[in-house]
């Protein structure tokens, strides 16, 4: 008799458990809401603002959120690379600089920033190439800065002739 009662209790418990599993979502269908395409841009701007104020923890949160919202956004990769560069996390910085220029080779600001990073890492020739890539964009407003950076980096090779060439180009 007890065996029969315990079987009924077990069956009842399993039934209740299964019913609970099927109604856990409240019976409502789950809808996917696509993120606002501008949200990633806004989070990049917020991240840069927090970074300028030295609040790196919140900056990282905002930039990671931007990358979750749009993993293909070059400005998000560039911004988080700058943050990792400041934090001394060179491997992560390089990864995101590469992603940024890969996703938009004409993104001159990222090319220039990547060049600065490479020059700091003593990869002078590669850095100079990034600076020159930055100057190829006719709409880039900081060509003189990129050429000055190329001259500074060429000076560290050391190639005084090449450095002088870039410095003179920067002045024109």
What are the residue ranges of the model-derived segments?
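Bacterial Sec signal peptide processing site at the extreme N-terminus
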Residues: 18-38
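Residue-level recognition of tetratricopeptide repeat
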Residues: 39, 46, 73, 107, ...
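Canonical tetratricopeptide repeat
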Residues: 45, 79, 113, 147-149
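TPR alpha-solenoid repeat register
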Residues: 76, 110, 117, 144-146
